[in-house]
Amino acid sequence: MPLPDFRLIRLLPLAALVLTACSVTTPKGPGKSPDSPQWRQHQQDVRNLNQYQTRGAFAYISDQQKVYARFFWQQTGQDRYRLLLTNPLGSTELELNAQPGNVQLVDNKGQRYTSDDAEEMIGKLTGMPIPLNSLRQWILGLPGDATDYKLDDQYRLSEITYSQNGKNWKVVYGGYDTKTQPAMPANMELTDGGQRIKLKMDNWIVK
């Protein structure tokens, strides 16, 4: 079904407690060089992952709307992934399944939409301009197409600055889950002007 221009999927309003739970602390201490062999090895270890999944809390804050949802992200192969957003009551608000050349999204009324651009689809249906194409790399702790970034003292991403399509995103990582190997991001915050996107990962399963 073609995408409508102004249809918005309604998620429940953001609760104040969620903002606290998803807060990101800017890492302190000296950073490491992006040219270091440790950083190159970490990137390679992450890229070698064939399958992974994570779940946690999602928050979107702007002057126009404040939204909270639980999310589940599952990558099953190269450019094949599934994103699920649920409201605080556990009901599915959005399910997105992507594979090369085809993206399908089902909303909370069971309506199905198709496109070849997941980022554009989510933006039109939710009103939230989520940089999904870049976020697929950022959520793994990889810079993607960004060349302006900083590392923490453990040779992992601590900050990214990236400009594209009139957006100027700054990504700050608040910590990593060291129970997984390689270590994966535990929480992160994306900002562009008055927009903020917060992700707090409860856990990771990597293969």
UniProtKB/Swiss-Prot annotation:
Oligomeric form and interacting partners: Monomer.
GO BP, sorted A to Z: lipoprotein localization to outer membrane; protein transport
HAMAP family: LolB
UniProt record similarity statement: Belongs to the LolB family.
Pfam families: LolB
Role played: Plays a critical role in the incorporation of lipoproteins in the outer membrane after they are released by the LolA protein.
Residues where lipid is bound covalently (N-palmitoyl cysteine): C22
A GO CC term attached to the entry: cell outer membrane
Localization in the cell: Cell outer membrane
Species of provenance: Escherichia coli O45:K1 (strain S88 / ExPEC)
Membrane in keyword set: yes
The entry's keywords: Cell outer membrane, Chaperone, Lipoprotein, Membrane, Palmitate, Protein transport, Signal, Transport
Claim: Transport is one of the keywords in the record: yes
Lipid linkage positions (S-diacylglycerol cysteine): C22
Gene name as annotated: lolB
Upper classification of the organism: Bacteria, Pseudomonadati, Pseudomonadota, Gammaproteobacteria, Enterobacterales
Record's protein name: Outer-membrane lipoprotein LolB
Leader peptide range in chain numbering: 1-21
Entry membrane topology: Lipid-anchor
